[in-house]
Amino acid sequence: NTQNAIYSALSQVASALGFREGPIHAELRLASDGINFIELASRTIGGRCGRVIEFLTGVSLETIVLANAVRQPFRLDQQAGAFGVMMIPVPCAGVLRRVEGITAARKVPGIVSVDIDIREGHRLVPWPEGGPYPGFIFSRCKDADQAEAALREAHTKLSFVTAPELRVKVA
């Protein structure tokens, strides 16, 4: 199973780096040749992605980290189902005019929220040179496959309308 393979690979890499306790942030890509790590760091998950931890356990990420740091016991109430988050990728370069399809994306079964953080006039720059994600999509479903499918479907409903960025050179 994919989750077991990820857990095994993550355990090996974290151990090789000397990580023994505390939070670990991992970003990886599943490819035809296996698991490719993008980032592995001794830190918590960043930004709003940490909301998934509270969805899954009923306890905030900050509470878990602090309790672990001072060796205080805490109770996690594992919630049924699977939760997912998509950091919405920057679709193209340009100046944002509007985002269409937000209501349709929110209506996809399993979607908890669609949060767009950028506003009209924001300069969009795709990765790898790009800046922050334009927003996040959160899902909750019976299993991980359904949670991922809901995220992907909601993402297809979004359309970022942009204008070209016109650079002015003053001589």
PLM regions with names:
Residues 40-43, 117-119:
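Generic beta-structure capping elements
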Residues 4-26, 32, 41-100:
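Active-site "cap" helix and flanking loop/linker of ATP-utilizing ligase/carboxylase catalytic domains
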Residues 34-36:
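Conserved protein kinase catalytic/activation segment
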Residues 1-8, 12, 145, 152-157:
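Active-site nucleotide/adenylate-binding loops and adjacent lid/helix of ATP-dependent enzymes
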Residues 66-171:
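Peripheral (often C-terminal) accessory segments that flank ATP-dependent C-N-forming ligase machineries
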